[in-house]
Amino acid sequence: MLALRSFFYLLLKFPLKLLVRCKIITDSQNITDQPNQPIFYIVRHQSASDLLALQSACKKQNLPDPLGKVTINGESFNRTLCLAKSTPLCSWRKSSKTTATAQGLALLNQHVIDENIDAKLIPANLIWGRTPTKERKNLNIGTLLADQESPNWLRKFFIVLFLGRDTLVRFSEAFSLRNISDNHGSDEAAAHKFLRVARFHFHRQTIAAKGPRLMHRKQMFTALFANPSVKRIISDEAKNKKVSEAEIKKKALVMMNEIAGDYSVSWLRFGEIILHWLWKRLYSAIKVSNAKVLRKLAQDGHEIIYVPCHRSHMDYLLLSYVILQEGLVMPRIAAGINLNFWPAGTIFRKGGAFFIRRSFGGNRLYSTIFREYLGLLFERGYGVKYYTEGGRSRTGRVLAPKTGMLAMTIQSLLRGIDRPLTLVPVYLGYEHVMEVGTYHKELSGSEKKGESMFGVLKAIKSLRNYGNGYVNFGEPMNINEFLNKQVPDWKDSIDPIDPQKPSWLTPTVNVLADQVMENINKSAALNGVALIALILHASKNKALSKLELETQLDFFLNIQRQAPFSEQLTIPEETGAELLTHVISLNKVTITEDSFGSLVSLSETANTEMRYYRNNILHTYVVPALVCRLLDKHSKINQDELVIKVQNVTALLKEDLYLYQDSTHVEQQTLRVLTVLKEMEIAKQTKAGFWSLSDDVGLLSQVHAMAECIDESLQRLAIITSLTSRLAPLSKRDLETKVVAIAKRLSVLNNINAPEFIDKRAQSTLIATIREQGYIDLDDDGLLIASSTMAEIKATVINLVDIEVLQSIAR
């Protein structure tokens, strides 16, 4: 019998090799670290195609052969436990049970007999295709392939034939049979229990990869028209405009067609193939961080809402591709209506996009339909992705969040959704953004051009090596838990019929939106282009010798490796020299040779474009830069005083740069930075606790470069604190106008070509933060005046700014 099975598997291997292509995702780490301990697998189906596909995947992962045998204390065991046999083709025949329970019991008993055994059991889930089940009763090829629960051999033949090249093999974290035996017993009940847990585990995992039942557009429209809120708004609109409800329904249907996506798995599969081909030609690598947490969320039944930063139109494609590659279902994506042009609009809809207008413009019918459509997506269990910034950042810094989508998300929760809603901030980083040149023109006053097919073709024509792409999944934010802390009685506002807008909604959403942006920044990705942009913009003439730039890169990297901005920050493993070589290959810098060696500089065009990449990571160096500036400006400074000054200035920049750090985090990073500087012999500390810089001129240049990174922010603070102290009382509007005027003057004098430096909204944010920190008060007439603590913070700031800047402000 064994020989016959082996011969059968041998016959199947060749056709399966042609028909099956496995995408492997593993959560199991360091399984082979204990080579003397036996390894077993558990799978859903006792199927030859499943086992042979698993064998191929295990070979690629250097894992033991699942078709092999394991001998424990002289007793032989199959390495793979199968939970269910295939359903018989004839309905009157009953499916026999597998030996999984008996083998599980025998394995647990071996752990009772021999205390030295600690066998590992790896759940291996094989998912053929990513087609979710559909809400339709008629049998067709789609439903035939979608239903994979214990398929008979004929159904499995078609599944392998049509879906074999889109097979996902998911290795979960191995669990210890020793732990089960010691804590749950080794009887038949214990064996049944862990097999039951495995079945549930596979079910949740499959839902996470394929998604819930697919609802078609017409079904969604029917559900929306049956929604009480939509019914009410149609009735109200008909009465107010004195037309028939049928006419309003026609308008509503047009809006639904404009909004709704048209999700197609076949389109997604085709798009994934195209994108895989494209990324291989565009990017050296796509680096993904923290995806394991994401998979666990999906498997635990969370409603995942992706909230990425928005750098480029490429974001839509890159993040969607990565989500699919990580074995998760494609979310429904909120896209701007400007992307709904032929043929991109149709393609995006098939990929799961739904479209949103830039402004609802007081259109109650549209806003109601859109809100209820979003709520329906959540209710049906579909993941969603939207950009809280509302549009692409033109400066490289994250933008102030638009809160509309977040508000509608919480309103959906107030309809009584059972599953937890969890926001996943996503940091998207690039070493080349194809729109950067266009962004600079728009910031310089050029009119923004609308999207079109011509623009897409033009962009494709200019495709070249874009370096690396980065997708960092941030710390998940459970909205239910957030509301429990912010509004303990929020559940009192739940109403499954009428959409609620309680008084606490707006302020709570504002807090949540800020936390989202902070968590995006918390998960930043450092890269060679951004680091070189940061360092060269901190140099006097935007130029350094090649050797000096490599040294600076190593210093900047070392600071983050030993005193990181956050645990989520990703840092390149390469040396400074390796990063510079890579950036030179991307043509981002100009190399000039002279008798002394090579000079690295920025051309006039690159100077403005590289500022974009500098701004991507500037926030990660705020604390190290402030520490270096304080040491640079003081011959000696007490440690406690230094920490307080860093805390005070960082608090003023928190809203402007969306820093997640509170005073405790700032203190911890400050002390770590000081320790690193001491270990590098750049700074020294006396027994009395005073810090000062070393006398080594070569080392001091590194400190100067780091300190210069924060200079523009300090200049803006100096302008505001000086003008408030000197000109108060004055209105907020007058202060903003005067601050912008001086900022423009300084930008000319110091050659600061930075739109954010003179942006009125950015100055307004800084003024608001300074007021929130208690340095600005209001007089009886509602005008701004300096508070009693203004003098202290003003002194701190102006002592960190060059005298030439202060003279310009004083004039």
Swiss-Prot record:
Protein name, as recorded: Glycerol-3-phosphate acyltransferase
Keywords noted in UniProt: Acyltransferase, Cell inner membrane, Cell membrane, Lipid biosynthesis, Lipid metabolism, Membrane, Phospholipid biosynthesis, Phospholipid metabolism, Transferase
Catalysed reaction equations from the record: sn-glycerol 3-phosphate + an acyl-CoA = a 1-acyl-sn-glycero-3-phosphate + CoA
Listed GO CC annotations: plasma membrane
Residue span of motif HXXXXD motif: 309-314
Membrane topology: Peripheral membrane protein
Native source species: Colwellia psychrerythraea (strain 34H / ATCC BAA-681) (Vibrio psychroerythus)
SMART domains listed in its UniProt record: PlsC
Domain-related comment: The HXXXXD motif is essential for acyltransferase activity and may constitute the binding site for the phosphate moiety of the glycerol-3-phosphate.
